[in-house]
Amino acid sequence: MEKTINIALCEARHQMPECVTGAIYPNTVDPLDIAGITETADVFMREHSGDVVNVYVTGLTVCTIAVVKAALMLLATESARPRTLTLWHFDRATGDYYPQTIIYGKEENAVGEAILYYAYNC
């Protein structure tokens, strides 16, 4: 059953909207541990196959890239995939978050839809 997951990228790094529950990574992450960062992202994306995933980006580019890569690898290689992956970035001017949709897939042609969506909307 499809769920909507609202999660921070890294725990307790910034103020989060009330809808956010939990984080993919702990507050302290070793940015040089690419293998560990990648494994965490892979496990998270597999656990949320079929879900609408909203990630509130709270720092560490290396972690953001690992999450996007994990989702795209699932799209390219397996039937398990997030239904939607949207990154939410903080706007200092407004104090709100704004979306960047990375994957928007419905059913069978999710890879093609994701590529076309990204190419024309990003």
Q: What role is predicted for each listed range?
A:
Residues 1-54, 66-122:
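Long, low-complexity, Lys/Arg-enriched
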Residues 57-65:
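Acidic, metal-coordinating catalytic cores used for nucleic-acid/nucleotide bond scission
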